[in-house]
Amino acid sequence: MTSLQDRIGTLRTGKLSPEFFSLQADPIFWQSKAGELHRAALLLAQQFFEDTEALRAALKALEEGQTADLPSQPTSVMSQFVLLAAFSLENLFKGLVLYKEPNLVDGGKTSGIMRSHDLLSLASRAGVSLTPEEHRLCVLASSAAVYWGRYPISNSAEVSLQQTKITGHSVRVFDELFQRVTLLFKERFHTRTRRVPQPGA
């Protein structure tokens, strides 16, 4: 195990046994990580809305002659909202997949679809049905996860983003999908719990 600790923080890394790795891959931990990312995504969305309203108010003041100063436009964080939303849904879907296919974590490694960022494929494998709007969100978010949510260019000029515009409605669609899939998580968890043999049974 290696350890690094200073004023920046603490980081410890080391090799895990395959058994302990499998324990850490339990679906409940995927749900927990999804919750962290869900909250962070919504915080970014809220900041975007506040920035937008502040800019509108500043422009209105300029038009009405209340100020002569040109308003500054803060750096947008909306694409990062989509990025974190994608990672949140990815964790939820992968956790549900593992309820059905725990063998996808074996020998201290993940395999197959567990290494994918394709939200449509993950949702299908997890048994999650999507509305047309949720389907569209997953397509958009999947592309953000591997490209425009993180980098200014793609890996190839042949597949490059020409324009993107994210609406406030996407935040609601994401949040409602997250809440719905979280309920599926609870159902799967209780189903699994009922299947665990009780002592003396």
PLM features: what roles do these ranges have?
Residues 1-42, 101-201:
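Long, charged low-complexity segments
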Residues 78-79, 99-103:
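Alpha-helix boundary/capping segments in eukaryotic regulatory proteins
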Residues 77-85:
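Extended HEAT/HEAT-like alpha-solenoid repeat tracts in very large eukaryotic scaffold/adaptor proteins
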Residues 80-81, 92-95, 148, 153:
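Generic hydrophobic/packing signal
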Residues 21-72, 84, 91-100:
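Short, contiguous, well-structured surface segments enriched in hydrophobic/aromatic residues
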Residues 70-77, 131-134:
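Acidic, serine/threonine- and proline-rich low-complexity regulatory regions
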